Amino acid sequence: MEKLRLLGLRYQEYVTRHPAATAQLETAVRGFSYLLAGRFADSHELSELVYSASNLLVLLNDGILRKELRKKLPVSLSQQKLLTWLSVLECVEVFMEMGAAKVWGEVGRWLVIALVQLAKAVLRMLLLLWFKAGLQTSPPIVPLDRETQAQPPDGDHSPGNHEQSYVGKRSNRVVRTLQNTPSLHSRHWGAPQQREGRQQQHHEELSATPTPLGLQETIAEFLYIARPLLHLLSLGLWGQRSWKPWLLAGVVDVTSLSLLSDRKGLTRRERRELRRRTILLLYYLLRSPFYDRFSEARILFLLQLLADHVPGVGLVTRPLMDYLPTWQKIYFYSWG
């Protein structure tokens, strides 16, 4: 037990001292998950396990860096715990679905889907109604920008002391002065002005308080949160081949977005969330039964056409053609 505690402390120290290397590790783990997909039997489950682990690793490392840098989330401790649990569920939901299908079959798979969606809905309702958290965003916790947030200042960089950069007279290239060059492990290779702009923008995003929602916006958000449960309930009533669950979910999503479309004064992150939800309406082209009857043949034909006539594109489109049927059948990929 003592060895595990020491190992944990060493890992925390490594993350705080080498945030850039930690980010590279997270990217490597995520990339490894892509390489595993479709390579052998049960590779999809293993690939998703590695991908879920990479997302949990990002969440863990961000928590370590926030604690070290004292950059707490601008919310209460109880709300932070709810956001963390919601983030964990979003990280592992696909693997839980695939694992349940492998172990318990279709009945176990749908039971796990229903339990996960119910848990997420309860957490989001608490955030919306109890904590007045405003618009629900994805991901629930803003990931840290390692280049701008995880770099401790090396000395006083205030403009009053000395210039942070030098502009070449002939090349107009911006170069950091020697006095403002940070230590090697935390060095940022962009121009100082770029870093400052990103720091300011990311700081505003992290510290921005959610926009208070009126009755209309609260109803819209309630519909958005309830949509997965309504869709699952309609699937149980009318079956997976019926158009009614597809139409019901689409109407609920469009209604929610329509009620939110006139809201002014949203934060940058909330505006980005609304754009994300609007773009996700395209997923209805990939959701059954529309996909089975209309989209599948056309999408596969287009991918095959690109693979046959555009050099190099086949390296991407052929694996995509192989994986698309598997992806489309996973509930949390297409409907989550």
UniProtKB/Swiss-Prot annotation:
Compartment(s) where it occurs, according to its Swiss-Prot or TrEMBL record: Peroxisome membrane
Coiled coil regions in record: none
Bilayer topology term: Multi-pass membrane protein
An example Gene Ontology biological process: peroxisome membrane biogenesis
Chain positions covered by the region annotation Required for peroxisomal location: 66-81
Keywords per UniProt: Disease variant, Membrane, Peroxisome, Peroxisome biogenesis, Peroxisome biogenesis disorder, Transmembrane, Transmembrane helix, Zellweger syndrome
Peroxisomal topological segments: 106-110
Biased composition (Basic and acidic residues): 144-160, 195-206
GO CC, one annotated term: membrane
Transmembrane segments: 85-105, 111-131
Domain of life, per lineage: Eukaryota
Region called Interaction with PEX19, residue ranges: 221-336
Annotated region described as Disordered, given as residue ranges: 142-171, 184-210
Cytoplasmic side, ranges: 1-84, 132-336
Record-stated family: Belongs to the peroxin-16 family.
Role: Required for peroxisome membrane biogenesis. May play a role in early stages of peroxisome assembly. Can recruit other peroxisomal proteins, such as PEX3 and PMP34, to de novo peroxisomes derived from the endoplasmic reticulum (ER). May function as receptor for PEX3.
Subunit text: Interacts with PEX19.
PANTHER family, per database record: PEROXISOMAL MEMBRANE PROTEIN PEX16
Connected disease: Peroxisome biogenesis disorder complementation group 9: A peroxisomal disorder arising from a failure of protein import into the peroxisomal membrane or matrix. The peroxisome biogenesis disorders (PBD group) are genetically heterogeneous with at least 14 distinct genetic groups as concluded from complementation studies. Include disorders are: Zellweger syndrome (ZWS), neonatal adrenoleukodystrophy (NALD), infantile Refsum disease (IRD), and classical rhizomelic chondrodysplasia punctata (RCDP). Peroxisome biogenesis disorder 8A: A fatal peroxisome biogenesis disorder belonging to the Zellweger disease spectrum and clinically characterized by severe neurologic dysfunction with profound psychomotor retardation, severe hypotonia and neonatal seizures, craniofacial abnormalities, liver dysfunction, and biochemically by the absence of peroxisomes. Additional features include cardiovascular and skeletal defects, renal cysts, ocular abnormalities, and hearing impairment.
Protein name, entry field: Peroxisomal membrane protein PEX16
Organism expressing this protein natively: Homo sapiens (Human)
Name of the encoding gene: PEX16
